[in-house]
From Swiss-Prot:
A cellular-component GO term for this protein: endoplasmic reticulum membrane
Keyword list, A-Z: Endoplasmic reticulum, Heme, Iron, Membrane, Metal-binding, Microsome, Monooxygenase, Oxidoreductase
Protein name: Cytochrome P450 2C21
Taxonomic superkingdom: Eukaryota
Record-linked InterPro entries: Cyt_P450, Cyt_P450_CS, Cyt_P450_E_grp-I, Cyt_P450_sf, Cytochrome_P450_fam2
Stretches assigned to coiled coil: none
UniProt organism field: Canis lupus familiaris (Dog)
GO MF entry, a single one: oxidoreductase activity, acting on paired donors, with incorporation or reduction of molecular oxygen, reduced flavin or flavoprotein as one donor, and incorporation of one atom of oxygen
Amino acid sequence: FIVLVICLSCLISFFLWNQNRAKGKLPPGPTPLPIIGNILQINTKNVSKSLSKLAENYGPVFTVYFGMKPTVVLYGYEAVKEALIDRSEEFSGRGHFPLLDWTIQGLGIVFSNGEKWKQTRRFSLTVLRNMGMGKKTVEDRIQEEALYLVEALKKTNASPCDPTFLLGCAPCNVICSIIFQNRFEYDDKDFLTLLEYFHENLLISSTSWIQLYNAFPLLIHYLPGSHHVLFKNIANQFKFISEKIKEHEESLNFSNPRDFIDYFLIKIEKEKHNKQSEFTMDNLIITIWDVFSAGTETTSTTLRYGLLVLLKHPDVTAKVQEEIHRVVGRHRSPCMQDRSCMPYTDAVVHEIQRYIDLVPNNLPHSVTQDIKFREYLIPKGTTILTSLTSVLHDEKGFPNPDQFDPGHFLDENGSFKKSDYFMAFSAGKRVCVGEGLARMELFLLLTNILQHFTLKPLVDPKDIDTTPIANGLGATPPSYKLCFVPV
């Protein structure tokens, strides 16, 4: 007991010293308690809402303590733009994320830093660009998968169904075709297991328990909890990816790379004599996991949430279908060239992403050097939270931001109107590496669904609730059922 008291006293003393040292440098914020910081002032079920209230008191730049470490929060378009776009290099670091630091070990694209991040990201973008111009382009793969999805939806026979599973299959298979060269049947056992891991991981990551884990990783890591399920899921995903890599190694043709794995294996071979090379087998595994994690569950959740919003707004859905049938017709599949002739549909796809606000607080950034931001001094390595909610729901960019209105992206002539406030994929040097892919998937999959089906709700549209059931790392829509009635 005495040892425990001494340890706690040391921690409190260190905390107070550290806090005093930072006074006059970091932005203002609520007074943190020793050890636990401001965790009692943060609603871990809806961090975004708590940050909104704090911004009312402390302005667009303030400091909160998740545990003992300070986090600088940037709230509103002006502050977020100044950091991520105007000063993108200084804010390009990836912030501390204890939940995944344990397993990722600083590898891959999403959670890496420095030269490892720059080289891996640059290489991955180049490969995706090359595949976009190949014999079988990324658009071809999405269109092919859209047809499989339509056939699967037809098999529901217009009966009530939960769309979660089927809307997860299509984006996951698109990633599979890019990474592994082949897609899976929707009843494939390995495929179903992989899908379940991604879905469960996102649900776990959005819980209050995980917010506490990130604040107190050393304390909670050894306690029972859902984080152990997540670690187990990730380990099984790594095993699945490793097996696919082994299969590729056995059939690799250096002069004819088939997919992302082949390109990466060739790069590893070319740099095998460079001991400082960032292209290793471990980095390949984590990079693939990053691409899957970022490209599967986010897109499928957006589709699932999008259909729920469209059920709530049948008038909007009817206008989209009219435009699809007028521009595309019924006898061919929509393609990306059609988008420029379909401003209303394009606006609806953008408004869905803005309205649902899928990643409310972005992934954490960090500053790569000591900087002066406005009148504050922010030390190198400080974690930065950029509130995407505050940008996507900014009244200056989107009048009546809490209303679902495709008019947010249309001008007075009905033409599509871009908005600098649209940061659904973040912005700057850490903008989502799969943004181009996700934009194609959302447009092509949604238009294919609405080309072939009328969405029939099981309740009156007025009674449909679109409020997320969880709002941690990601916004999770409530579960629902609908009928896909063939047109």
